[in-house]
Amino acid sequence: LAGSVFLVNLISHLLKEETMHIKKCFTAIFISSAFLSAGLVNSHAAEAPVQQQKVAKPNVVILATGGTIAGSAASNTQMTGYKAGALGIDVLLQAVPEIHKVANVKGEQISNIGSESMNNKIWLKLAKRINELLAKPDVDGIVITHGTDTLEETAYFLNLVTKSDKPVVIIGAMRPATAISADGPVNILNAVNLAASKDAKGRGVLIAMNDNINGARDVQKTNTLRVDTFQSPELGYLGYFENGRPVFYKATTRKHTIDTEFDVSNLNDLPRVDIIYSHVNDDGRMAEAAVANGAKGIVHAGTGNGSIHEAAEPALYDAAKKGIVVVRSARVPNGPTIESTAAWDKAGFVHAGTLNPQKARILLQLGLTKTNDPQKISEMFKQY
């Protein structure tokens, strides 16, 4: 009996040992399989090609208004006497396929006129469309094609009423699109580069012509024919283009775009403001005519530092007494118009600072949508 018990215990012990051995074997096999599987997965991951993530191109909208940049002439050597605003936006874009490498570009036709005929209606239509587009998250910048005659005025108007810090770039051309060395295509390419650039954000409305970058407030058309006509003689360029890449060296310090108080969203027209150009033998009759024809403001383009002919003073004093705001500017191209005689200050005449007459007129127009108080208007001229 004792032998039988011993035999049973021995067999039981051997079975337990075998079971433990089998468990260890299965554990080892499981762990090995896990490592092998991991190795295979890692091996496949290492062998898989690395896919580079595509960087989305910016979205730029080009708004066309006409001008020489869309002009057409009888021959490719004709640089004057052409028809401005003859070509549509689609034709302009087809001439510069390189822009599509820079951004996703769409075009819209706002108008197609020579810019000498620009008016308040088109200005307001353009401004409202710009604000509508820039409010969309998928629009990164705007380019406006425009005639050069009033380009500086449209640029400054938009600089005061655009409600976004996204880039807005305005361009034109001094030679028609049909010219043998038309300057429009490179201006379009540079403008798209600028509108697509994050460096252009928050700088106000910019002008991109002849490889230079000007600010809307200070830019002037300085020559009737040359392609380098747009300059900022008093305060200089903001930057330039280097192989299409915008390079900035300066920034404007006056308020613009999102920092202004002006809102044109509900406006259908702008107050009438006339410019009176002073000259020898000025007798004030032009100022009287402006008042008689409903002007709400007068910009006096005076001689020297905004000087007023003594024979014209009574007409301007009378206008001010009637609640018409009078701004003194200068017909001299450079230099500020500053405070002068006590009589002019007492009459409430506002001085334009470094704004030329045509830009002083724009600021006065917008100022009059808020107030006709000369003191408040004067503060605007110090800020903008």
Each language-model region and where it sits:
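C-terminal non-catalytic interaction/assembly regions of soluble proteins
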Residues: 305-384
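ATP/NTP phosphate-donor binding region
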Residues: 47-132, 314
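Short Gly/Thr/Asp-enriched flexible loops that form oxyanion-binding sites at enzyme active sites
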Residues: 144-166, 308-317
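Short, Lys/Arg-enriched N-terminal segments with co-localized hydrophobic residues
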Residues: 1-19
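Internal gly/pro-rich beta-alpha loop/helix module
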Residues: 171-242
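Short, acidic/small-residue loops that bind anionic groups at enzyme active sites
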Residues: 154-186, 193-196, 321-330
